[in-house]
Design a protein with these regions (language model features):
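Short, solvent-exposed secondary-structure capping/transition elements
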Residues: 134-139, 464-465, 478
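Nucleic-acid-processing active sites and adjacent nucleic-acid-binding tracks
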Residues: 218, 471-526
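Phosphate/NTP-binding elements of NTP-utilizing enzymes
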Residues: 2-456
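Extended hydrophobic-aromatic, low-complexity segments
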Residues: 263-264, 279-280, 465-466, 477-479
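Gly/Thr-rich phosphate-binding beta-strand-loop-beta motif of the actin/hexokinase/Hsp70
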Residues: 448-474
C-alpha cells in the first residue's frame, strides 16, 4: 500500500470503531442513517482498483466526525425527523418497494410534480445540519441582561445559550445528485420555521444560476401556500404584510459581480456552485458577495451557510482554498482519535459531505476508464443518473478533444487536482526541527555563517500578511556541504479572522504559534 492508501485504511478503521455500538442510535434517528453508515463500511476499500470501493477518504472522515459529535453533543431526533417528513411525507414499504402514502411536498420531475423520498446520504446531510445542539458561551457577563431567553442560562460568570451546533455545511459532489433540491428545501424550511425575521440569500456566479435554487424554493412554497400567505416574485419570496404577526421572513437571489448593499441581516446563505468561482487579478466577485452576506450574520443565534457545488474548470479559486481547509479539518479526526489533539467547538460547527475521488484516482485516464470511481462522486448513480449517461458524455468529450468539463462536473475534480505535487507534506514533515528563524545566528571565527532572504506577502486586510524566510548556512567554499532553513510568520486582522470561513484553521495556527492576530485595522509585525 502507498502512504495515501494506508491513510485511507486508518480512516476506515476509525469509522468502524466509532460506529460499533452506535447502530441502534442511528436507527432510532432514521433507518436510512444506519443504512448510510453500513454502506460506508461495506463499500469502502484502500486497495487500488477494488470494484467495491465506493466511498472516498473525506466522505469516510466526515462520517467519523459525525459519529464523534453524536457521542459528544445533544441530538434533537424529533427535529430531524420533522424536517425529513416535511418534504417526503409518509411512506410504506410494500413487497420491497417504497410507496408514498400521504403528505410531503411535490418536487419537479420528468412526469410532473412528485413527492420523493430522501436518499440515505441526504438523511445524513440533514441530520448533520439540524440534529446537533450545544451550549454556546456568548461571553456576555452574567447578570448583564434584565431577562434571559428560555434557551439561556448563567454559568461560570457568563451567559450560555443552547443552540444548533452546525453553522456551516458543505456538500460537494458531481452533477445530478439533487444539490438544487437539497438547497431549495433548506431555504423553504428556513422561511417557515427559523427566525421570525429570517433573511436568506441564494448566491451564485450568474443571475441564471442564482435563480435556479430560488425558483425551487418558490416552487416548494407555492405547493403548500393554500392561503396566499407568500409574495413570490422573480426577486423576492416573503411573507405578506398581513401575516407579519406570524413571520416577516424573506429570501432572495443574489448575483456575484452585481450591485449589493450593506444593511442585510442574514440568517441563511446558500452558495450554489461556489466551486466554479475563479480568482481574477487576485479577487473573486463570488467571494466578495458571500463575505458581505456572511458578515451580516453576527447577531444571529443560529445562522447557517450551505455550500452546494461540484468542481469548476479552474486552477485557483476561493472554494479550492476552503476545500483544502476542510480536508485538513477532517484529517485531524485521526489525531483526535489518537489523543494527540483535542476537538475544537468551532471546528465541530462545520459539517461536511465531500464526495470526491481518492488522491490516487484523479489522473484523467483513470477517471475516464474506471467505472467504480463514479460511485464516489455520485450516490445517485442508478437512481437519477445512469452509467450510460457517463459513457455517452465521456465519449462525446473525447471526440471533441476537450474533457475538462466532464472531469470537473461529472467527477468533481479540479484542474489543479490533476497536477502532481512536486514537494508533498509527507516529505517535509520528517525534516521539521524545533527551531525558529531567530536561532540562525551562528558565528564561526568572526564570520556570520547564516544568510537570510525574506519575502513579504502584503495584504489589504482581507487575507493574511506573511513573511517567508530562507536561511542558508554558508560553509567554506571548498566543500559542497551546506544547510538550508525555511521559516515563516503570518499576521491576520482580528476582524478578518472572526469573519473568515477559514477561522477554525486560523485558530489552530494561532494556537501553534504560526499566526499572530492584530486588533484594529493595522498589521503590527514588530
Amino acid at each position: 500500500m502507498t502512504e495515501q492508501q494506508e491513510n485511507k485504511q486508518r480512516a476506515i478503521d476509525l469509522l468502524e470503531s466509532r460506529y460499533r455500538g452506535m447502530e441502534n442510535v442511528c436507527e432510532t434517528i432514521d433507518m436510512r442513517l444506519r443504512m448510510y453508515f453500513e454502506d460506508l463500511l461495506e463499500h469502502s476499500s484502500a486497495r487500488e482498483d477494488d470494484p467495491n470501493d465506493w466511498h472516498g477518504l473525506y466522505e469516510l472522515l466526515g462520517g467519523a466526525k459525525f459519529l464523534r459529535c453524536l457521542d459528544t453533543y445533544n441530538f434533537n431526533t424529533k427535529k430531524v425527523q420533522t424536517v425529513i417528513r416535511l418534504r417526503e411525507g409518509e411512506w410504506r414499504q410494500d413487497e420491497g418497494v417504497w410507496r408514498h402514502i400521504s403528505g410531503g411536498l411535490k418536487c419537479p420531475g420528468i412526469a410532473g410534480g412528485q413527492v420523493y423520498r430522501w436518499a440515505p446520504f441526504q438523511v445524513f446531510a440533514l441530520a448533520s445540519i439540524y440534529g446537533f445542539y450545544a451550549w454556546i458561551d456568548t461571553q456576555v457577563p452574567a447578570g448583564s441582561k434584565p431577562q434571559l431567553l428560555r434557551t439561556e442560562r448563567e454559568k461560570d460568570g457568563t451567559i450560555w445559550d443552547y443552540r444548533r451546533l452546525c453553522t456551516d455545511f458543505t456538500l460537494t459532489g458531481s452533477r445530478k445528485i439533487d444539490k438544487t433540491g437539497f438547497g431549495g428545501f433548506i431555504g423553504m424550511e428556513f422561511m417557515l420555521f427559523e427566525d421570525y425575521n429570517m433573511e436568506g440569500f441564494c448566491c451564485a456566479n450568474s443571475e441564471d444560476r442564482a435563480k435556479i435554487i430560488f425558483r425551487r424554493i418558490k416552487y416548494l412554497l407555492s405547493g403548500l401556500d393554500t392561503e396566499n400567505r407568500f409574495r413570490l416574485t422573480e426577486s423576492l419570496a416573503a411573507w405578506r404584510d398581513k401575516y407579519s404577526e406570524i413571520s416577516t421572513a424573506s429570501i432572495r437571489p443574489m448575483t456575484a459581480g452585481g450591485k449589493f448593499k450593506d444593511g442585510w441581516f442574514a440568517q441563511l446563505c446558500l452558495k450554489d456552485e461556489f466551486g466554479a468561482a475563479p480568482y481574477a487579478n487576485g479577487k473573486s466577485d463570488m467571494k466578495m458577495l458571500v463575505d458581505v452576506i456572511e458578515s451580516s450574520m453576527g447577531p444571529r443565534r443560529e445562522p447557517l451557510s450551505v455550500t452546494m457545488t461540484s468542481a469548476g474548470r479552474i486552477t485557483e479559486g476561493p472554494f479550492i482554498q476552503i476545500l483544502d481547509g476542510l480536508h485538513g479539518m477532517l484529517e485531524r479526526e485521526q489525531s483526535i482519535a489518537k489523543g494527540e489533539v483535542q476537538p475544537v467547538l468551532t471546528d465541530d460547527r462545520t459539517m461536511t459531505l465531500l464526495l470526491e475521488p481518492d488522491a490516487w484516482q484523479k489522473e484523467e485516464q483513470y477517471l475516464l476508464t474506471n467505472k467504480t470511481v463514479r460511485h464516489k462522486v455520485n450516490p445517485m448513480l442508478g437512481v437519477i443518473v445512469q452509467h450510460q449517461f457517463y459513457d455517452d458524455q465521456i465519449a462525446k468529450a473525447q471526440r471533441d478533444g476537450d474533457t475538462g468539463e466532464v472531469i470537473a462536473k461529472l467527477f468533481n475534480v479540479y484542474s489543479s487536482g490533476k497536477v502532481t505535487k512536486w514537494i508533498t507534506g509527507d516529505r517535509i514533515r520528517p525534516l521539521q526541527v524545533a527551531k525558529r528563524i531567530e536561532d540562525c545566528k551562528y558565528i564561526d571565527q568572526g564570520r556570520e555563517r547564516w544568510k537570510v532572504f525574506c519575502g513579504m506577502d502584503f495584504s489589504h486586510g482581507d487575507d493574511l500578511y506573511a513573511h517567508g524566510y530562507l536561511a542558508v548556512d554558508y560553509l567554506p567554499s571548498n566543500t559542497m556541504r551546506g544547510r538550508f532553513f525555511f521559516d515563516c510568520d503570518a499576521w491576520v486582522l482580528e476582524k478578518t479572522m472572526m469573519e473568515s470561513p477559514n477561522r477554525p484553521l486560523y485558530e489552530e495556527w494561532v494556537s501553534q504559534g504560526w499566526l499572530k492576530v492584530c486588533p484594529g485595522e493595522v498589521f503590527d509585525s514588530i
